[in-house]
């Protein structure tokens, strides 16, 4: 069917259709957001992504050509899914504001993926004693060699992946490292910049299951 390239995207063997008035044929030949000039049309055999299901002509007309508060265009948000037509979801928010500016699309996708609508209320509880996590039976617990929990967060007022610039990435790293310097006790730790790791540090982090090959 295809294989993954160095960026993790699949390389499908599909033929670019002949031009068709009023639509942009989706596929790996799309390289830039500006290439999506008209309503995206997905190959019939690759129409299972949430983007394909949610991106009706009405949604396209409501969002096309618009930009969110960070300056990220709607076409930028959907480019990956239009390029990689076998995607599961197929879109990326360019900033926190994308969810508001492009709500006609993102609301539908979140409802399909998370199974709740825009009226649902998120309830936060930071009391660990309220967690319903009974101990595992001894035979099951014995099979666990190590566990790893990854927590990802985004800084307010910065674009997300598709919209952030190299300069902003450096700014985020600078702010985060300065904040880490003030952490003590259980929050204390070590910050590692991937582009500055020595081989010894890299090997040790891999051995400790913090860094993956």
Language-model regions: role of each:
Residues 2-213:
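Long, Pro/Ser/Thr-rich low-complexity/intrinsically disordered regulatory tracts in eukaryotic proteins
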């Amino acid at each position: 069917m295809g294989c993954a390239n160095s960026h993790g995207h699949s390389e499908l063997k599909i033929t670019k259709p002949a031009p068709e008035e009023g639509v942009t044929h989706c596929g790996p030949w799309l390289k830039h957001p500006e290439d999506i000039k008209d309503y995206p049309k997905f190959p019939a055999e690759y129409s299972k992504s949430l983007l394909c299901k949610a991106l009706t002509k009405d949604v396209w007309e409501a969002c096309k050509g618009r930009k969110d508060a960070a300056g990220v265009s709607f076409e930028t948000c959907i480019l990956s899914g239009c390029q990689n037509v076998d995607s599961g979801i197929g879109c990326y928010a360019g900033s926190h504001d994308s969810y508001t500016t492009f709500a006609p699309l993102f609301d539908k996708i979140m409802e399909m993926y998370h199974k709740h609508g825009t009226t649902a209320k998120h309830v936060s509880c930071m009391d660990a004693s309220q967690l319903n996590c009974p101990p595992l039976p001894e035979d099951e617990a014995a099979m666990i060699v190590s566990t790893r929990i990854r927590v990802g967060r985004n800084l307010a007022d910065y674009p997300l992946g598709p919209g952030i610039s190299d300069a902003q990435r450096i700014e985020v790293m600078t702010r985060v490292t300065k904040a880490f310097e003030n952490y003590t006790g259980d929050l204390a730790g070590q910050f590692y910049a991937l582009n500055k790791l020595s081989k010894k540090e890299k090997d040790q982090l891999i051995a400790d299951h913090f860094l993956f090959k």
